[in-house]
């Protein structure tokens, strides 16, 4: 099941890079304080 989470995270990152809703919502270093990304 670990690969499923990896694929999900990669897809989420690709979506965030392709069309960012808010610059503050993109997780870069894993330290996200004020973003509303599910699972992050």
Swiss-Prot record:
GO terms for biological process: defense response; innate immune response. It comes from the Eukaryota. Keywords: Disulfide bond, Immunity, Innate immunity, Secreted, Signal. The keyword 4Fe-4S does not apply. One of its GO terms (cellular component) is extracellular space. Its main location: secreted. Pfam families: DIM. Disulfide bonds join 32-35. Hemolymph. Residues 19-23 form a propeptide. Residues 1-18 form the signal peptide. InterPro entries: Bomanin. The keyword Secreted applies. It is found in: Secreted. Secreted immune-induced peptide induced by Toll signaling. Has a role in resistance to bacterial and fungal infections. The strength of antimicrobial activity appears to correlate with the overall level of expression. Belongs to the bomanin family. This is Bomanin Short 5. It comes from Drosophila melanogaster (Fruit fly). The gene is BomS5.
